[in-house]
Amino acid sequence: ASGEELFKSKPCGACHSVQAKLVGPALKDVAAKNAGVDGAADVLAGHIKNGSTGVWGAMPMPPNPVTEEEAKTLAEWVLTLK
């Protein structure tokens, strides 16, 4: 599945949209923050799969039911967004 398909089929949309901040940051802002950062896709994939805290403020991101491969596909897709 493509990153966009995974975004739509997983619970991502409950907290994120591409263009606007919801509970979590807009995905275009995640892409902008990580533009040109070495290893950004791997770090982001880890956040998608395992969750994270304190990256975008107080709201934690929960772990998500995705495989390593799905997390990587999602991360790579997010990083292409503008």
From Swiss-Prot:
Species for this entry: Ectopseudomonas mendocina (Pseudomonas mendocina)
InterPro entries: Cyt_c-like_dom, Cyt_c-like_dom_sf, Cyt_c_ID
Residues in the signal sequence: none
Residues binding heme c, per UniProt: 12, 15-16, 61
Keyword Membrane: no
Function: This is a prokaryotic monoheme cytochrome, unreactive with mitochondrial cytochrome C oxidase or reductase. It functions in nitrite and nitrate respiration in Pseudomonas, but it is also found in other bacteria.
Pfam families: Cytochrom_C
Key words, A-Z: Electron transport, Heme, Iron, Metal-binding, Transport
GO molecular function: electron transfer activity; heme binding; iron ion binding
Modifications after synthesis and translation: Binds 1 heme c group covalently per subunit.
Protein name: Cytochrome c-551
